[in-house]
């Protein structure tokens, strides 16, 4: 007969807070800091303006400035990174509050498929021939959400 130790509510709360803090500092924070550093490097070198100019015609189809493409590219790699890129671009004045609001659902619908392909799909033994289809669906969902958000906001 095993004895089960029961924790009180306060102990469970403190344990959950510790785990949450660990997740935030080891998983989320490095992505956000990396995104800020990359955007600052792109800005200092002038590449951010170049990317904005190159992507402007395509992003204009969704009513967004060209720099918004960097948020979507970051979302392919990391959701936390995409949030960091969006925050950095908003701070720099390249994106307005409206632009960030429109991009937010797209960042989450994109769902960092590059990480998921390795982590989730590989572990679940999904056939690799379906990876491009899965990533394409993520991108299409994200782009459609931008149009929907432009109508709503």
Swiss-Prot record:
Residues 1-31 are periplasmic. Keywords: Cell inner membrane, Cell membrane, Membrane, Transmembrane, Transmembrane helix. One of its GO terms (cellular component) is plasma membrane. It holds the Pfam family Gate. It is found in: Cell inner membrane. It is a multi-pass membrane protein. The chain crosses the membrane at residues 32-52, 69-89, 90-110, 133-153. Residues 53-68, 111-132 are cytoplasmic. InterPro entries: Gate_dom (IPR011642), SpmB (IPR052549). Its main location: membrane. PANTHER family: INNER MEMBRANE PROTEIN YJIG. Belongs to the SpmB family. This is Inner membrane protein YjiG.
């Amino acid at each position: 007969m095993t004895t089960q130790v029961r924790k009180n509510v306060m102990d469970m709360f403190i344990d959950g807070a510790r785990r949450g803090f660990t997740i935030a500092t080891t998983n989320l924070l490095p992505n956000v800091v990396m995104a800020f550093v990359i955007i600052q490097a792109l800005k200092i070198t002038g590449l951010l303006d170049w990317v904005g100019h190159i992507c402007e015609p395509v992003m204009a189809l969704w009513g967004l400035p060209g720099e918004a493409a960097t948020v979507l590219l970051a979302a392919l790699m990391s959701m936390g990174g995409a949030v960091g890129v969006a925050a950095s671009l908003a701070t720099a004045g390249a994106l307005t509050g409206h632009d960030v609001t429109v991009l937010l659902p797209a960042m989450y619908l994109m769902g960092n498929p590059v990480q998921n392909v390795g982590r989730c799909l590989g572990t679940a033994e999904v056939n690799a021939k379906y990876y491009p289809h899965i990533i394409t669906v993520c991108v299409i969902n994200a782009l459609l959400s931008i149009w929907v958000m432009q109508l709503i906001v």
